[in-house]
């Protein structure tokens, strides 16, 4: 199943940023970037599902270092090309559910548009808990059709299908804050903030701490 996910997203690496803007518009990605830019004192950061690096740059200004990871070699190649010459960021292939990182290695873990497209997302949250220091921060943002009105929701789904085709069977397009909160509590995180951002299209933005 890991190879299936890697192949699904890797084939869109060259057009991913433009595809994303086509599907969800300009405003919601900008809203996520703004929220990320406002996160302070991130310290040593690991990003899971960095993709082409669209959101990664927002992490570099307020952190000591960023390890940006993805399962797709094609996505990582695109991201490395974007960040040539930036000293505090490295890229590597990693599975967010089972990594080689030591326990309590990071101050902050970030997952942008990942939690709703992976199978058994609790496993990834448990791994984040393992590699975060006590009191470490977890930041999650994911596009969601939850709370969207009917016509914009249908439009977003149609644009997704046009660009990327049928999603993987465990894709959760209507991830809610309640559902994610249950998973985070099971993984022993304390939620600090959870909100829906965006206008016509929406994203769930959440910050939690490791107990």
Cite the ranges covered by each PLM segment.
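A short SAM/SAH-binding and catalytic strip from SAM-dependent methyltransferases
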Residues: 108-121
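Conserved class I S-adenosyl-L-methionine
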Residues: 1-40, 54, 78, 82, ...
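C-terminal alpha-helical "lid/dimerization" subdomain adjacent to the S-adenosyl-L-methionine
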Residues: 19-22, 141-187, 192-195
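Core SAM-dependent methyltransferase catalytic element
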Residues: 187-189, 193-211
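A short acidic, Gly/Pro-enriched loop at the edge of an enzyme's catalytic core
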Residues: 97-109
């Amino acid at each position: 199943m890991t190879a299936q996910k890697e192949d699904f997203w890797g084939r869109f690496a060259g057009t991913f940023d433009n595809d994303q803007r086509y599907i969800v518009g300009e405003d919601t990605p900008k809203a996520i970037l703004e929220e990320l830019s406002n996160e302070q004192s991130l310290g040593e950061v690991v990003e899971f599902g960095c993709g082409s690096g669209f959101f990664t740059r927002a992490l570099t200004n307020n952190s000591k270092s960023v390890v940006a990871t993805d399962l797709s070699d094609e996505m990582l190649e695109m991201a490395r090309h974007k960040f040539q010459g930036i000293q505090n960021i490295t890229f590597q292939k990693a599975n967010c559910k089972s990594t080689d990182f030591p326990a309590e290695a990071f101050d902050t873990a970030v997952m942008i548009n990942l939690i709703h497209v992976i199978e058994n997302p609790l496993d990834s949250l448990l791994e984040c808990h393992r590699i975060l220091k006590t009191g470490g921060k977890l930041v999650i943002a994911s596009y969601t059709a939850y709370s969207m009105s009917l016509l914009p929701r249908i439009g977003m789904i149609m644009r997704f299908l046009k660009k990327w085709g049928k999603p993987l069977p465990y894709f959760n397009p209507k991830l809610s804050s309640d559902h994610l909160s249950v998973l985070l509590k099971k993984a022993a995180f304390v939620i600090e903030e959870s909100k829906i951002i965006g206008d016509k299209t929406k994203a769930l933005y959440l910050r939690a701490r490791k107990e």
